[in-house]
């Protein structure tokens, strides 16, 4: 990965993709930003619109492109996929989005791309797994957005409950980016203090925390029911992961990471903190879990494994 000229390709110029493109331009990340979508007229329009923002941020070449452009990219970000509609769960999207992902990954690999994949299309844990299988890439070079957005939602909720800044909250949602996710409260801290100790001192009960966990789990549905889709939060989460990759930060972020025995799991992508740098996932950090959390992780993994197995069997067979 070049330090002087970095290239990012976005595949999927819908609400999430275009919001991500805007976030990347605002942050001045990468010198070249290409956008691929079936709707080429939209990508051309977005590229022209984003180009007008570059004098206020940093010089950047922004343009609509095709898959051949991926050849020398450092990072390919996939947001393409059918959106989650009101009343749908993320797992309801499996079959149709697996087909879309397969149609995307094959031409990217054919182009000669050798960089990092970052996946955000839902259900993201299963689609990240599928990208790795379809591409044949080393597992560290395929990263899912995982529970990055969910963890941000948890930190915002805890910041309100404890009346502190969310930047001083260190807490993660883990497992599926979806209905079986859970809050790892036992390892959470606020200002370096264990969350449970601080909660007890402030008279905040575990029931209060579990209610917050449920609110976080359902926040996406509230947003979708109000405005039709979520995109600003996840786009910013994608920008943060991209920054860690492009700047080789060794940042610890909650992402969709491949399991190699962590939490007793193998051959699955699931939400957990990991070290992110120019190589993608440099290290998976196995967070100590209490009994409640360990059961939730195992149950979530079982759900993902079953759906991934069935979905991949359909598309491959």
UniProtKB/Swiss-Prot annotation:
- UniProt GO MF annotations: L-lactate dehydrogenase activity
Instruction: List positions binding substrate.
Output: 84, 90, 122-125, 150-153, 230
GO terms under cellular component: cytoplasm
Query: Where does the record place the catalytic residues?
Result: 177
Highest rank taxon of the organism:
Bacteria
What sort of enzyme, by top EC class, is this?
oxidoreductase
Record's keyword terms, sorted: Cytoplasm, NAD, Oxidoreductase, Phosphoprotein
What processes does the entry annotate via GO biological process terms? glycolytic process; lactate metabolic process
Q: Which reaction does it catalyse?
A: (S)-lactate + NAD(+) = pyruvate + NADH + H(+)
Q: EC number(s) per UniProt? A: 1.1.1.27
**Binding-site residues, NAD(+):** 16, 37, 42, 67, 81-82, 103, 120-122, 145
Compartments, record wording: Cytoplasm
Q: In which pathway does it act?
A: Fermentation; pyruvate fermentation to lactate; (S)-lactate from pyruvate: step 1/1
Q: Name one Pfam family in it.
A: Ldh_1_C
InterPro entries recorded: L-lactate/malate_DH (IPR001557), L-lactate_DH (IPR011304), Lactate/malate_DH_C (IPR022383), Lactate/malate_DH_N (IPR001236), Lactate_DH/Glyco_Ohase_4_C (IPR015955), NAD(P)-bd_dom_sf (IPR036291)
The chain residues annotated with the modification Phosphotyrosine are: 221
* Family classification: Belongs to the LDH/MDH superfamily. LDH family.
Q: Per its database record, what is this protein's job?
A: Catalyzes the conversion of lactate to pyruvate.
Subunit structure of this chain's protein: Homotetramer.
What is the designated name of this protein? Answer: L-lactate dehydrogenase
Query: What species does this protein belong to?
Result: Limosilactobacillus fermentum (strain NBRC 3956 / LMG 18251)
């Amino acid at each position: 990965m070049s330090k002087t000229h970095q290239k990012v390709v976005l595949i999927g110029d819908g609400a999430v993709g275009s919001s991500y493109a805007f976030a990347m331009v605002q942050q001045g990340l990468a010198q070249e930003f290409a956008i691929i979508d079936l709707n080429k007229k939209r990508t051309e329009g977005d590229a022209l619109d984003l180009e007008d923002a570059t004098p206020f941020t940093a010089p950047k070449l922004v343009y609509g492109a095709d898959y051949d452009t991926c050849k020398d990219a450092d990072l390919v970000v996939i947001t393409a996929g059918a959106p989650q509609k009101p009343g749908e769960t993320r797992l309801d999207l499996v079959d149709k989005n697996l087909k879309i992902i397969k149609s995307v990954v094959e031409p990217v690999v054919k182009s000669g791309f050798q960089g990092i994949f970052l996946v955000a299309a839902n259900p993201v844990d299963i689609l990240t797994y599928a990208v790795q299988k379809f591409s044949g890439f080393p597992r560290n070079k395929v990263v899912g957005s995982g529970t990055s957005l969910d963890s941000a939602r948890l930190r915002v909720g805890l910041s309100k409950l404890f009346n502190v800044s969310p930047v001083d909250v260190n807490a993660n949602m883990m497992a599926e980016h979806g209905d079986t996710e859970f809050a790892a409260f036992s390892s959470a801290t606020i200002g370096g203090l264990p969350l449970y100790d601080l909660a007890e001192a402030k008279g905040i009960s575990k029931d209060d925390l579990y209610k917050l966990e449920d609110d976080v789990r359902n926040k996406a549905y509230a947003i979708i029911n109000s405005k039709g889709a979520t995109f600003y939060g996840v786009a910013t989460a994608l920008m943060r992961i991209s920054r860690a990759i492009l700047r080789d930060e060794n940042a610890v972020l909650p992402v969709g990471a491949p399991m190699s025995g962590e939490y007793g799991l193998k051959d699955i992508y699931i939400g957990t903190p990991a070290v992110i740098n120019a190589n993608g996932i440099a290290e998976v950090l196995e967070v100590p879990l209490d009994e409640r959390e360990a059961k939730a992780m195992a149950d979530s993994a079982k759900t993902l494994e079953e759906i991934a197995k069935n979905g991949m069997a359909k598309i491959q067979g």
